[in-house]
Structure formats: C-alpha cells, structure tokens
C-alpha cells in the first residue's frame, strides 16, 4: 500500500457520506487520534508505519487502522468480534475513505491464531479493548504470536479505578453518568445497573469482575516476555477533543507522576508500547 495522493481528504469524504452520525463521529475521532497522537508517539520511539504490516484488534469503524495506511503501512488487518459491524460499517468506511484493508471477525482469546497471521506484523494495536477481555495474560500471549521479532504492541485502556473505568456512562440512568459511581460497594452499584434496560448492562457487569489495572497489565506483559518500550498516563485523554468535537479540551498527561500508584490507578488512560524480543 502507498500513501494516498496529496489531494486525498478522507475526513471530508466520511463527513460527506450518508453515514449514521455515530459512525461519522467515531471514525473521524479514531483517524485524528491516530494522526495526532498515536503515530507521532510511535515515531518518537523509532516505530514507523511506513512499509509496516499493521493489525488492529477490536478495530471497530477502523479509523485508527486506516490512518496507519495513510501513513504508509504496506498491509493492514482489522479484527473485531462484531462481524456485523465489520461487514456493514467498517467495510463501507474503508470504501468511502479510499483505503484497502483486510477485515475479519475474530476473537483473540477464544479462537486460534491463523497460521498466515503468525509472525507477520510489525505493529499490533489494541486500543480500549483489553479491559473487556477475560484474561489479560492469554490476550498478550496470543498477540505476541502475531508479531515479528522486534515487533511492537500499542495498547491503551482506561483502568477500572479511573473516573469512568466502569463504563458506567453507557447505562441509561442519569446517576450512572457520575464519575467513580462504579467504585461504590458492588451491591449498591448493582442496584443502579439493575435499573437500566441498556444492551450494555451485561458488559458493565463483566468489567466490574475484570477490574483491570495498569499494574496488572505491566506485570502480565513482563511475564509474557514483552519489554516495556514506553508507558504514558493521562488525566484527560487525547481522544476527548475529537470524540466530543471540542478542540479546546486539552490533553493532560501525568506520566511524570506515575511512580505514584494512586496516579496509575486514577489515570483516565494508561498507554503502553510493548516490544517482543528481536
């Protein structure tokens, strides 16, 4: 794959298409997050998308993955457990934006890694996905099989103990929108969950069991043979300005304070670059 012509404007193409407003918002926020934050971060650590084979697990609308193609990725694979989303939304977005990507329904924990994926990728991305997975260690172990020697995993997620780490904002009650309400005693929080009818109810309950932390990810990564190339922590996430279409929202990084456990626990985003041995 080669970068798009200089007059190519994928964001304008997506905005102009007859897409659901949520699809438009999500794709653009993903694309701009990758261009404005993720790809520059990778470059600062010597990881380039140019000529690279890239995979994104849990790619959703595919904006991040397609930004990697725009940056020169030679091959791009997007997977998600929601096959209907890939078929009806992501494929359409790729066509409208003018990118060639492979899209496949796949579960990184419960399904085998196809032979032709193993050892193929220079970069794998797992953005806001790992907190939903039942076993962090198995996920990291399986992803390691995708990577070439010296390959890098980019991983971001909101720790459970962060203000909205319980994803309680997905529930359809006003009180559930409050920060830290998921940190109430489980029996009390469960009462709020039980009052909702949202399809996200079961996922909020699952997250309350998983309760993923940055420290658990760090420990699992080292145990699975990764080296921590870099780690960052944010009190205000880089994606907010694009996700909510509020350019004035700052990105507030608190990595300089991350030696303190409470900072790692309360950060709204933990982000890691993990490298497998060469």
Residue ranges of predicted features:
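A short beta-strand submotif of the Rossmann-like class I SAM-dependent methyltransferase core
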Residues: 126-129
């Amino acid at each position: 794959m080669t970068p798009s012509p200089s007059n190519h404007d994928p964001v304008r193409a997506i905005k102009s298409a007859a897409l659901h407003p949520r699809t438009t918002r999500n794709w653009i926020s993903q694309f701009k997050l990758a261009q404005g934050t993720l790809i520059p971060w990778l470059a600062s650590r010597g990881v380039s998308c140019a000529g690279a084979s890239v995979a994104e697990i849990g790619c959703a609308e595919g904006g991040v993955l397609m930004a990697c193609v725009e940056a020169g990725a030679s091959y791009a694979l997007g997977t998600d457990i929601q096959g209907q989303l890939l078929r009806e939304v992501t494929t359409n977005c790729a066509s409208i934006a003018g990118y060639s990507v492979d899209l496949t329904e796949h579960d990184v924990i419960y399904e085998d890694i196809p032979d032709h994926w193993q050892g193929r990728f220079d970069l794998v991305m797992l953005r806001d996905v790992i907190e939903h997975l039942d076993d962090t260690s198995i996920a990291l172990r399986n992803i390691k099989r995708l990577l070439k020697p010296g390959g890098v995993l980019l991983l971001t997620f909101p720790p459970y103990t962060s203000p909205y780490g319980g994803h309680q904002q997905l529930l359809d009650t006003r009180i559930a929108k409050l920060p830290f309400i998921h940190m109430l005693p489980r029996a009390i929080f469960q009462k709020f969950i039980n009052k909702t009818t949202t399809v996200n109810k079961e996922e909020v309950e699952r997250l309350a069991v998983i309760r993923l932390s940055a420290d658990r990810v760090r420990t699992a990564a080292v145990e699975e043979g990764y080296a921590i190339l870099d780690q960052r922590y944010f009190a205000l996430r880089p994606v907010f300005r694009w996700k909510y279409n509020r350019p004035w929202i700052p990105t507030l990084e608190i990595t300089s304070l991350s030696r303190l456990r409470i900072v790692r626990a309360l950060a709204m985003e933990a982000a890691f670059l993990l490298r497998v041995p060469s």
